[in-house]
Amino acid sequence: LKGYDVLLDEYERGMTADKYDEFFNLIKSELVPFIKKVLAAQKPVHPAFTACTFPAEKQKAFCEYLRGVMLFDKDKTMMGESEHPYTNNNGNCDVRITNHYYENALASAIFSAIHEMGHGLYELQVAGDLQDTMSGGGVSMAMHESQSRFFENNVGRSREFWQRHFPVLKSIFAEELEGVELDDFLLYINRAEAGFIRTEADELTYPLHVLIRYEIEKGMFDGTIDEENVERVWNEKYKEYLGLDVPDAGKGVVQDMHWYGGSIGYFPTYALGSAYAAQILAAMNRDFDVYSAMGEENVGKIAAWLKEHIHKYGSSKAPSEIFENAVGAPFDPHYYIDYLKSKYSRLCGITI
């Protein structure tokens, strides 16, 4: 390995620029035009979601309810508060997550909680005999991200999940959500929007934020982009892919800490994790009706499958080996594209 491949391999063992090129070229060709169709066809969200204040204490109460749904064992976990949500652990008996509560954005804390509990559940389910060894944790950045995004997006934004849990949310926010129906909530939590900030991006546009960063990183290594032109190229790509005019560096090239902390090659794992999640969903659905399981009282059936096929191995095998054994095939990004297109064409009433 040499050049950019060295850094890519550091964050996701076995990945190279050639492999990522195939992945991101598919995202560019398939999702850029599709996203433009979705943005033009979306219905407006219910005014309650933008007009109401959602008290932090009520949000915390619902996130505590979600701990039970996610099997986030209170004897082994804790949930605190921080400026930016994160997960930390000391083995499979001490997993800690944090959250942040914005009173003008109901969905933010809900999906941060589910996301971080997805990370945490992975660590909780690593086999006991791997604890206190070098293999006693998640196998890779992308595989870890696949677990958090699987629960956040594939499960947590599904109709089946909220058919079960929306009544609880509505009971906690009885005044704020008066007159709001399940379909209104589903449109709200799945709304796509072209935005400047990667960490605030929705499920559909998120991979384009990562695509832009990948293309810039690769360009700096192959000599097609000079460092002094990074901001200009960044702004051009946001205009090309998302139709946005970046107003300043804060909403542009300096928004992430990764490059300034030396973490070059990290960004692609975020999109790869989402793509892994889509293929895991398809594999799981071959073994049992995963959509029915999403609507159960808790995620027990789903978590048991993930433990048996992914979690229990920790990092005792290569990421690709664990993934391919779990899904029964090599990684195929078409599952991700098909998942997004199918979901958003249904939501927006458009043809693919």
Where are these regions (language model features)?
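Contiguous, non-catalytic segments that form substrate-binding/exosite surfaces or channel walls
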Residues: 1-106, 329
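C-terminal, non-catalytic "cap/extension" segments appended to globular domains
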Residues: 210, 214-352
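Active-site recognition of the HExxH zinc-binding catalytic motif
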Residues: 108-128, 145-149
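Secondary-structure capping and boundary motifs in well-ordered enzyme cores
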Residues: 23, 55, 89, 93, ...
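Acidic/polar loop patches that form or flank catalytic/metal-binding clefts of enzymes
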Residues: 75, 129-133, 156-167, 227-228
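Active-site-proximal binding-pocket segments
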Residues: 124-125, 151, 155, 159, ...
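Post-HExxH zinc-binding segment in Zn-dependent metallohydrolases
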Residues: 137-178
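All-alpha helical catalytic cores of prenyl diphosphate-utilizing isoprenoid enzymes
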Residues: 31, 56-59, 63-80, 89-91, ...
